Amino acid sequence: MNRVAIVSAKRTAIGSFGGSLKDVSAAKIGGDLVKQALESVNLDPNLVDEIIFGNVLQTGLGQNVARQIAVNAGIPKEKSAFVVNKVCGSGLKSVVLGVQSIMVGDNDIVVCGGVENMSAAPHYTKNARFGQKLGSFELEDTIINDGLTDAFENYHMGITAENIAEQYNIIREEQDEFALASQKKAALAIENNLFSEEIAPIVIKTRREEITFDVDEYVRANSSLESLAKLRPSFKKDGTVTAGNASGINDGAACVILMSEKRAKELGLDVLCYIEGYASTGLDNKVMGLGPVPATQKVLEKLNLNIEDIDLFEMNEAFAAQSIAVTRLLNLDLTKVNTRGGAIALGHPIGASGCRVLVTLVHALIKDNKEKGLCSLCIGGGQGISMVVSRK
């Protein structure tokens, strides 16, 4: 089997809901990003065999946003492209599929990633096509319906976090402390330019000016335990999950360029990291936030590794409650986890986050001179996905 290398790992800065990226299409966000990723390693777009992109909120984007991204990035129309929807795991599953295609010899070079513009996600009505004789039309929100609602229990993802908090006795104060730590780490990372190598700037044209968007705008550097404590529970009257200790609704994209180790050597490209292994699992949808636990255990077992063998972890912070439970159940050293902050601070553009955690992990390993890293996400509906990468 071909050993698969990452030769470029880039992401956009993450936009707030209704923020800088709200009027920029997913196809443009992704296309601009992929173009810059290719340029960063002077890779001829003609050499790319396939483009695989995660995306969850597809309503209104037009046919196959991955194909649109590829064309916008200057990749020839003769090349293949397709979209992956594994909810929050979409962006990482796209990488898994790219790796597999290279390992079996179907492709030499693949661009994989994820994109989401949650701000641009439309509302819709189900009953308009054949008419409604009486009564009003009801609009539904695609963000809530297709991105944030459990299809089996018909309740918000926040309730799954409440379920975990109750099951593992994770109190509100613990969740707020975890959220504050994420904010502080992210703010410090931005202050120290730790994201400079991974962020590709997006130029946004308005009527009056051009704006370069290159700093994560969702981070709340001035957060405090006092301000977090004032927030009301979001999903349950006497609950513990709030807007402050949950991830945001956000816009952004991330991508990696994959190729075999042999191809990288032929092209004279530096390898950032190698993909060592990956695993996906399912579990009870009512506690979907625990998904990283079995997925991580599975990939470590496949690779004959222990948790102590991993130098850095990027665990997607859907909610503080599930993040705390995951770190406890896996017995993670918190000094190794989300060292630049996580989704509670940076944001969670759902189709992009799977690749975003990978991109951040790759650059953290390089900057911190560490060898092995693991990234993982919980997935709405009751799944988990994990991946291990190494620099050697």
Which residues fall in each region the model found?
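Active-site-proximal alpha-helical scaffold in enzymes
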Residues: 86-116, 165-194, 255-262, 349-370, ...
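Flexible glycine-/small-residue-enriched beta->alpha junction loops
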Residues: 109-163
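Short, well-ordered amphipathic alpha-helical segments that serve as non-catalytic structural scaffolds
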Residues: 26-42, 65-69, 94-97, 157-164, ...
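N-terminal extracellular/periplasmic Venus flytrap/periplasmic-binding protein-like
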Residues: 11-12, 23-27, 31-32, 40, ...
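Glycine- and Gly-Pro-enriched alpha-helical subdomains that act as flexible
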Residues: 261-309, 327
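Conserved beta-ketoacyl condensing-enzyme motif
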Residues: 22-89, 93-109, 115-134, 199-214, ...
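Conserved catalytic cysteine-centered active-site region
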Residues: 55-109, 151-156, 222-248, 329-356, ...
